[in-house]
Amino acid sequence: MEAAAKEWGGLTGATLNVYTIGSGAPSTEISARYAAGNAPALIMGDIQDIVTCVKSGYARDLKDQSWAKNGGLTYGYNKDGNLYSFPLCIEGRGLLYNKTAIEKTLGRDWDPSETKSMDDLKKLFDELVKGGMETPVALNQEDWSLAAHYLTLVYEEQGEKLEDGEKYIRALADGSEKIEDNARFKSLFDTFDLLMQYNSNREDPLAADYASNAADLAEGDIAFWFNGNWGWAEISEYYEDGTELGIMPVPQNDADNHAQEWLAGSASKPIMVDIKNNDEKQQAAALDFLDWLANTKEGNQVLVEKCSLIPAFSNIKEQATNGLAKSVQQAANEGRLFPGIIDYPGDHWSTLGATMQKYLGGKIDRAELGKEIDAYWAKQKLEPWN
């Protein structure tokens, strides 16, 4: 994005400074910026960050922008007839796989469609181990991977529609549902237990190194890695041309609601235009940059070729450039994506990420995990789902 800002600046004569944050939720930095009165003209965060800013009256309505009709209204954040976010890309997550390594180890052809259930996955893991791949899968230890990407599958896979997941988290918040009683929770965490059993980092799971996981998948030392298409950024450093990679749904025994066929995925990294700390001239420049990304060949190439993103806009004809992105793009084109929940509290991934780390590290059992998740949601006050 820094390169994109520089390229756009060279064309327009304007200056767009890109500020990045380290680890942790964007909500902390965004809140600090507003408290200091120096929020930037463009804010990229998680969807809950945009929702919070909209509630505070900080975001500009973007429905008048030309890109709105080409995907903005479909993938952006809409509220009360207004559009408040620019969808930078579509992202999907699940089990990343190295088909080349799997087939080499098995000595036969393999297709992800044959591995749908947890039982199928267990059988495949055992076959890979027998073929010499001692630990076929890698799990990350980061809180965002565990809570924002795996745990959230439980909410998102309650049904096909956004409202199914939104209503479920509200049921958790009002106490009418307990997560440990939920069939999807049981199914996904049966699989998570299996992933832990065959985890390449199982000797010290909380010391797992993200870059090492990427290298291991790219080089065929492991067959699977729970992650998303963004993992290509690290994988590409070790990737050998001709290696077949892709993303498949997390196999599980509960097949209801297309759980064995659909990927978790939605618009990611939404961008809003601030109206509280930025004047009309700054807002106009911000809008021009977004228009450049969505509506010019150069901007499109930044998204697809330089950033390896999956564009959310129908007018962009550039195709995904790697196997991970192609898997997600195909699922999106076929309508096989579970929509992402909008109303997560800003501390969801950090708080429940710590809980998930305890579970991954063997410090708590499944019952204790469920109780901590229930206790977290019991503290949340969510507006009724309209």
Tell what function each PLM region has:
Residues 1-51, 58, 254, 354, ...:
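Conserved N-terminal structural module of periplasmic/extracytoplasmic solute-binding proteins
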Residues 123-125, 166-206:
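Glycine-centered hinge/linker elements that transmit conformational signals in sensory
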Residues 27-39, 56, 101-102, 122-132, ...:
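Short helices/loops that flank or line small-molecule/ion binding pockets
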Residues 20-29, 48, 116-121, 203-218:
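Short helix-initiation/N-cap motifs at beta->coil->alpha
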Residues 6, 103, 108, 198, ...:
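Extracytoplasmic/periplasmic substrate-recognition and gating elements
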Residues 84-88, 93, 120-177, 222:
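Extracytoplasmic/periplasmic solute-binding protein
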Residues 46-103, 122-124, 149, 247-248:
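Hinge/lid segment of periplasmic solute-binding proteins
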